[in-house]
Amino acid sequence: MLRKAKTGDVRTIHRMINLSSSEGEILPRSLVDIYNSLRDFYVYIDDGTGEIVGICAMHIFWENLAEIRSLFVDHRYRKRGIGKKLVEACISE
């Protein structure tokens, strides 16, 4: 299930970003930064477990310029199109 991130998701988003950052995949972000940009995030939830397994944020600079930030999908859920769905959700907004 794909949805906009909620305040209760911030710690999980932060944990996922830190995990990915420690593996050299994305840049780290602070809790404050995530709270401040929460409206930019989408999360993907495993319907069976209710666990957040993917995250993505897009920051819009101008009408025709944006940047995908903090794209991460749990290793166990990769190669299923989840990252693509997250990016498409961010772009379609």
Positions of predicted regions on the chain:
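Short amphipathic alpha-helix that is part of the acyltransferase structural core
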Residues: 1-27, 45-46
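A generic local structural motif
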Residues: 27-31, 88-89
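Conserved beta-strand in the GNAT
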Residues: 43, 50-59, 66-72
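Short loop/turn motifs at secondary-structure junctions and domain boundaries
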Residues: 32-38
